[in-house]
């Protein structure tokens, strides 16, 4: 028995340890439940979070604004982000980086890079020799890639979200323009990795806007399709999207609302920035004309002046949207010369006339890609700040054919709210109402490969083949499997973009390389040698276009198949018994279970193998070209049966005949016969058919990225370390600034306090002069040498000053606390004395307190009175400039000791049951006669009437003034049910008038 107990103890300890670990994991998980979204615009970003108790909230930045500039200022020893960096754009435009997202995923010879150079000539861009991309050259020792700069912005957005949520956040959904190609999307993902963010999804900003619109109007969505057009003009680009809303049936959640992207059109350079650049150029021209006769320099050659003009152009664009004209003015634009000029809305519209002509373009592209007409569009909704320009709305009304444009959506925050809803849906920590999102592929992707064919006997040639992998406007996320049937040796194939004819010539040049990846397969021939007796079912390449729209090749496999016959095996007694019992209840052994003993692999493929074995080679080859042997593994076909009839490789005819034979021979499944008798084992063995066995061999893959090489892992790690060092430096800078501000604030506050009466009363002139001199010396040091002081030095200076002023502050603080503490002590002493007096008046037969308890309380009361009077007398003798002997902490200690004794007696009275009353012979309680003498009732009668009422006031709570809970919570009153007080009254032998609630 003892040994058993000893064995159980370690198990119990292990169980408790596991429970503790699980609880710790749950607590840690609860601290990281929040998710965030980043609506990454060209000019500014919006950040939103979802955390337990906070559903979908826009994050306020440090300046309490709902949107933050996407701006970074980089210097040798400091870095600024957000609004701080936007303010530095005027002082140091060369080190202030903006609109750098336009350079993501683009090589140095891209037209978009040349456009960026012309817009912002103050930035120096050099070429990365390995990737042929551009980098910002801040100084000879300082350079950053666009991905690194974006990583800084994403890290800053996470810090804002964490400060707002008050907990760490790692999971995020980031919006990207719908026209981003594979290289641009991978660049954003690399930037997120540098920032340490786990990207749940890259969601297109038009899809996020459509999701936000649908989530808040899900009650209006029904089975009837509603086509909505969203026209989103941002700072850098314009996107027009046609979305269809309707309810659909899902396997997991039943009928749910769905949005489907039907058509997309875009213009990469049409936006508010281009309008501001036109205005900036106009203002620069006006300024040069005003100084034409002064032989001044061209304002365009001054980066700081051009930065001021761009900021004023941004303000002008906003003001002219609501006013017919406005006065542009800048103080000290250049060479201390002020600039002032009047600009009208008509002039602004003339400057941007060619831009307004491009407004209908995305609408036509969206309609063409959706294969819809304007009559099918129910509503056109405006999104984005530049759509507030009146001319944009005027020009847009004509091509959309509507009387008015919809403005019933938050144009600035819709994408952020839709993205954070998707983040909550993708996170395992939240359960949201399902909303099906079907995004669309903008750029088609295909597979190209070359194969030898024999056109004539003895004449062989190479034939180029193309297979569309993901078609234009096809839904994603989606998985596809393509099968190569005519290869038995290693070969290569290429993944490229499909037909991009819908793009204009300029867009094609900006698009970049149309070749994505070259795939080299290794090990195909070895797989055929490994399974010489198996029939090849082709080389299957598994592709995945994930939720972020990023294409990946999951794996490549060589698949073989053969027919095998299971040898009859003698069943054990238990197996026979189990089969017999299951057959009696209509069950049987599943053929799936019989096949589990092999290495067969079940595939999720939609299309059967191409051609049968009886087909001639030419016919099978033609069929391969026509049918494009592609298999979608995202969902099985609805007609595909489950169970044995769904074995891979069967043709529809084989499945039908198989079902028929099984229907005619039910005993093959182990089912009971007509009379309920299970079949004989020998008969079952004879009727057992041959089954197909599939073998899968993994094929080696070597990828060569052609559009834009990804960062090597070592360079990526170097970039991560570079950003971490910058973040650490920023934290150290913030800590130093905090220490300097604390020191400066302490100096000013203390200098002011030295002249306040309450501080002068408790200090001598010499003490104040000493403190004042030290404060002045430290202030001078802070002004002269404080800029180069470290955080430790600043903290040491502050600690030195606090130590010097500690006695002064202590005396003032104690005198502030005395009135409140002494008043509380007096109240507690008075209540305790009254309580003790009432307790002593309780009759002996009803007494619940012992003499020791009451004596102890009386001693504590007397000691406290004595200590208080003595300490006050001693304190009165001391001068105010000396350390006081009456301390607030001592008063609190005395109060705690006295309150502890009173609470002990109160709790005892509350939980003590009343003693039973003695009964006479008639069964009634004995009560003393009303006219009994005082000598007969000396020990039982409560003396004078006034004391009796006082005791009742202490022992019985006021029913009118306090409820039961209030009486119980009062530390100086008994909160019992009142039985003791009633019994004391009966023992007293005095008749009292009954109260209303006792009648």
From Swiss-Prot:
Modified residues (N6-acetyllysine): 883
UniProt keyword list: Acetylation, ATP-binding, Chaperone, Endoplasmic reticulum, Glycoprotein, Nucleotide-binding, Phosphoprotein, Signal
PROSITE patterns attached to this UniProt entry: HSP70_2 (PS00329), HSP70_3 (PS01036)
Chain span(s) of sequence motif Prevents secretion from ER: 996-999
Induction: By oxygen deprivation.
CDD domains: ASKHA_NBD_HSP70_HYOU1
Compartment(s) of residence: Endoplasmic reticulum lumen
Sequence segments annotated as region (Disordered): 564-694, 909-999
Region forming the signal peptide: 1-32
Function text: Has a pivotal role in cytoprotective cellular mechanisms triggered by oxygen deprivation. Promotes HSPA5/BiP-mediated ATP nucleotide exchange and thereby activates the unfolded protein response (UPR) pathway in the presence of endoplasmic reticulum stress. May play a role as a molecular chaperone and participate in protein folding.
Protein name (Swiss-Prot/TrEMBL): Hypoxia up-regulated protein 1
């Amino acid at each position: 028995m003892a040994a058993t107990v000893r064995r159980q103890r370690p198990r119990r300890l292990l169980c408790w340890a596991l429970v503790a670990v699980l609880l710790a994991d749950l607590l840690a998980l609860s601290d990281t439940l929040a998710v965030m979204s980043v609506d990454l615009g060209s000019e500014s970003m919006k950040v939103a979070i979802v955390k337990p108790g906070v559903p979908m909230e826009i994050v306020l930045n440090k300046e309490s604004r709902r949107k933050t500039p996407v701006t970074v200022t980089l210097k040798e020893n400091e870095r600024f982000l957000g609004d701080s960096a936007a303010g530095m754009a005027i002082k140091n435009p060369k080190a202030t980086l903006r609109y750098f997202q336009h350079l993501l995923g683009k090589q140095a010879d891209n037209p978009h890079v040349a456009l960026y150079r012309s817009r912002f000539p103050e930035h120096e861009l050099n070429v990365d020799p390995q990737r042929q991309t551009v980098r910002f050259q801040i100084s000879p020792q300082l350079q950053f890639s666009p991905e690194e700069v974006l990583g800084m912005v994403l890290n800053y957005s996470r810090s804002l979200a964490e400060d707002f949520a008050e907990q760490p956040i790692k999971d995020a959904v980031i919006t990207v323009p719908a026209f981003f190609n594979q290289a641009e999307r991978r660049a954003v993902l690399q930037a997120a990795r540098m920032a340490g963010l786990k990207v749940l999804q890259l969601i297109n900003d038009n899809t996020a806007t459509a999701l936000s619109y649908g989530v808040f109007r899900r009650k209006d969505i029904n089975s009837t399709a509603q086509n909505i057009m969203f026209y989103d003009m941002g700072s850098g680009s314009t996107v027009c999207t046609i979305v269809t809303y309707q309810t659909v049936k899902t396997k997991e959640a039943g009928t749910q609302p769905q949005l489907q992207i039907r058509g997309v059109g875009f213009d990469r350079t049409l936006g508010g920035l281009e309008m501001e650049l036109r205005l900036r150029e106009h203002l620069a021209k006006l300024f040069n004309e005003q100084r034409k006769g002064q032989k001044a320099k061209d304002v365009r050659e001054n980066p700081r002046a051009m930065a001021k003009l761009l900021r004023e152009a941004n303000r002008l664009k906003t003001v002219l949207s609501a006013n017919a004209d406005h006065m542009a003015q800048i103080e000290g634009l250049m060479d201390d010369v002020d600039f002032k000029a009047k600009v009208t809305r008509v002039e602004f519209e003339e400057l941007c006339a060619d831009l307004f002509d491009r407004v209908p373009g995305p609408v036509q592209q969206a309609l063409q890609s959706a294969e819809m007409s304007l009559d099918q569009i129910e509503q056109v909704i405006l999104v984005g700040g530049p759509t507030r320009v009146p001319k944009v709305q005027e020009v847009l009304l004509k091509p959309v054919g509507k009387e008015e444009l919809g403005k019933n959506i938050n144009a600035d925050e819709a994408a952020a709210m839709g993205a954070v809803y998707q983040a909550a849906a993708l996170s395992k920590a939240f359960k949201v109402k399902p909303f099906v999102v079907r995004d669309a592929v903008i750029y088609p992707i295909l597979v190209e490969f070359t194969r030898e064919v024999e056109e004539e006997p003895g004449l062989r040639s190479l034939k180029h083949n193309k297979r569309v992998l993901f078609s234009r406007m096809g839904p994603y996320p989606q998985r596809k499997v393509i099968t190569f049937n005519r290869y038995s040796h290693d070969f290569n194939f290429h993944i490229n973009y499909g037909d991009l004819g819908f793009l204009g010539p300029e867009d094609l040049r900006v698009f970049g390389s149309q070749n994505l990846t070259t795939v080299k397969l290794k090990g195909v021939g070895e797989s055929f040698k490994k399974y010489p007796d198996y029939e090849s079912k082709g080389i299957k390449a598994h592709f995945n276009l994930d939720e972020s729209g990023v294409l990946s090749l999951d794996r490549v496999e060589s698949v073989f198949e053969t027919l095998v016959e299971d040898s009859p095996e003698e069943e054990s007694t238990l197996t026979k018994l189990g089969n017999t019992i299951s057959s009696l209840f209509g069950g049987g052994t599943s053929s799936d279970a019989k096949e589990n003993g092999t290495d067969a692999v079940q595939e999720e493929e939609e299309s059967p193998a191409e051609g049968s074995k009886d087909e001639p080679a030419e016919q099978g080859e033609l069929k391969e070209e026509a049918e494009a042997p592609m298999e979608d593994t995202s969902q099985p076909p609805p007609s595909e049966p489950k169970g044995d009839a769904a074995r891979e490789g069967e043709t529809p005819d084989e499945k039908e005949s198989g079902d028929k034979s099984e229907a005619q021979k039910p005993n093959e499944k182990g089912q009971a016969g007509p009379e309920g008798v299970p079949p004989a084992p020998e008969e079952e063995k004879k009727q057992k058919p041959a089954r197909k066995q599939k073998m899968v061999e993994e094929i080696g893959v070597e990828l060569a990225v052609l559009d834009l090489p990804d960062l090597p892992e070592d360079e990526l790690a170097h970039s991560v370390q570079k950003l971490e060092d910058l973040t650490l430096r920023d934290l150290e800078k913030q800590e130093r600034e905090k220490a300097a501000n604390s020191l400066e604030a302490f100096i000013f506050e203390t200098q002011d306090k030295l002249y306040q009466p309450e501080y002068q009363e408790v200090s001598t002139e010499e003490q104040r002069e000493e403190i004042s001199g030290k404060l002045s010396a430290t202030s001078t040091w802070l002004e002269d040498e404080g800029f180069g002081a470290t955080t430790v030095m600043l903290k040491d200076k502050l600690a030195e000053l606090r130590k010097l002023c500690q006695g002064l502050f202590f005396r003032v603080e104690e005198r502030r606390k005395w009135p409140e503490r002494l008043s509380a002590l007096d109240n507690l002493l008075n209540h305790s004395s009254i309580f003790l007096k009432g307790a002593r008046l309780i009759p002996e037969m009803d007494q619940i307190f012992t003499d020791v308890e009451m004596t102890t309380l009386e001693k504590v009361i007397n000691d406290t009175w004595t200590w208080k009077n003595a300490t006050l007398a001693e304190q009165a003798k001391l001068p105010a400039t000396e350390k006081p002997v009456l301390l607030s902490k001592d008063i609190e200690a005395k109060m705690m000791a006295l309150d502890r004794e009173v609470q002990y007696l109160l709790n005892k009275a509350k939980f003590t049951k009343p003693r039973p009353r003695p009964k006479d012979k008639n069964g009634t309680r004995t009560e003393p006669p009303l006219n009994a003498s005082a000598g007969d009732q000396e020990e039982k009668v409560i003396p004078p009437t006034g004391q009796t009422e006082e005791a009742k006031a202490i022992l019985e709570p006021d029913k009118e003034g306090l409820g039961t809970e209030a009486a119980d919570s009062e530390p100086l009153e008994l909160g019992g049910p009142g039985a003791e007080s009633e019994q004391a009254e009966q023992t007293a032998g005095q008749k009292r008038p009954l109260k209303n609630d006792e009648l």
